[in-house]
Amino acid sequence: MSTPTLTLSEDRLLPRESSALAAAREIYRSTKGLPIISPHGHVPVSWIADDMAFSDPTSLLITPDHYVNRLLHANGVDLEDLGVGRKTMSEEDNRRAFRILCEHWRDFAGTAMRYWLVDQLIGIFGITERPSPENADRIYDTIAERIAQPDFLPRALMDSFDIAFIATTDDPCDDLDGHARLAADETFTRRVAPTFRPDKYLEPAAGGWTGLLARLSEVSGCDATTLDGFTEAMEDRRAYFRQHGAVSSDHSHRDLGTIILDHDRAASIFDASVAGRATVEEMALLRRHLFTDQARMASEDGLTMTVHPAVHRNHDTAAFHRFGADIGSDVPVTLEVVDSLHPLLDKFGNTDLKLVVFTIDETLYSREIAPLSGWYRSLYIGVPWWFIDAPESVMRFKHAVTEMAGFSRVSGMIDDTRAFCSIPARHDMSRRLDAAHLAELVVLGRLDLDEAVEIAHRLVVEQPTQVFGL
């Protein structure tokens, strides 16, 4: 019996009706070859700075991809068997992990993960066999042979993927050595920027907060154990990040609550939090005040402020204690935006601030986020991420926001991934869905084809360039 083949239709995700398909093909062709701009993601800078060969298919395609890991876990796989939380994996361990993926291939049917994996297997590695227990080792060997070649080093992939700009995610106290080395290397022509991620420094109720303040004090040279010193330290580190090419900060709190406390009240709560005397309610107020002050800083220093709220992080407590964060056990929660952001937008909504609001609560797009972005100059709509970046939910997003906010108020494509080889697949999917949506408008007589082509280009290039100040 012959092995079933993997297929990758040239017209995947494009509309089936003939006139819409013709328009979508032309629109997609106009953006297919454009460089990738990736303003928010989680690829380690060390991969690119050190330019070391990827050691094996598992550590490249499986272990860092929490999209893949979470579904395998749901179907009975121990994350440790996928390399999660392990410092070393033997060759047999890596093969076993890859066999597990192939054994569970059917569990990915209909998911975005399968779509991206197929694109990677065919488009990057030339694999045309559908993964199965029988061919797992053969596919593993093909990928292993491919990644051992010089043209598969990370910097070479940056060129072959045509990634013009990519952002990493970094702690405010990071020295950004990898970014500095890349910037100083005249042979490296791509752009890799850090992203300022201060979440845990703004959460006085979180464990270890005072230890973080001590570290921040050490790195910045400011006494971060007082409100004024903390503010100075944050401004110092933001400036350091900008000097190393940063264009944005990223924030992920449970809610979007904002407030501007008077200085004495904020300082008093800050002091009480450092001393361990603040109430839960006071610490929540302080966190919202500190978060709002990041918007004030952004309006002054030019870093675009992105927010990824409404996630119950580390929902599986036992898995968190065993493996740590960012393993895929997060769960969406509901969110309220209009009232929560009102203090911030009332102060900074029509200033030079650029605020990109993401959500994984789809109900918010047409009810709250799109109407806000249709008024406030500072607010942009973040494209779907995490649980809602599959083709179906992306199209729902486009229909929900375009009718009231148009195309000029969206962030442009954000892949938000740790899976390096999935970046081309994710951006290609986005361009195909742009083409499908725009073709609908052309067929309905709401756009001319030349306008649709221009908008598609804008969504890929001009929009992220403008929103992130590239």
From Swiss-Prot:
EC top class, as a word: isomerase
Highest taxon listed in the record's lineage: Bacteria
EC number in record: 5.3.1.12
Gene3D superfamilies: Metal-dependent hydrolases, uronate isomerase, domain 2, chain A
Pathway: Carbohydrate metabolism; pentose and glucuronate interconversion
GO biological process, one term: D-glucuronate catabolic process
Substrates-to-products reaction catalysed: D-glucuronate = D-fructuronate; aldehydo-D-galacturonate = keto-D-tagaturonate
Keyword Isomerase: yes
Gene Ontology molecular function: glucuronate isomerase activity
One Pfam family of this chain: UxaC
InterPro entries per UniProt: Metal_Hydrolase, Uronate_isomerase
Keywords per UniProt: Isomerase
Family: Belongs to the metallo-dependent hydrolases superfamily. Uronate isomerase family.
Name of protein: Uronate isomerase
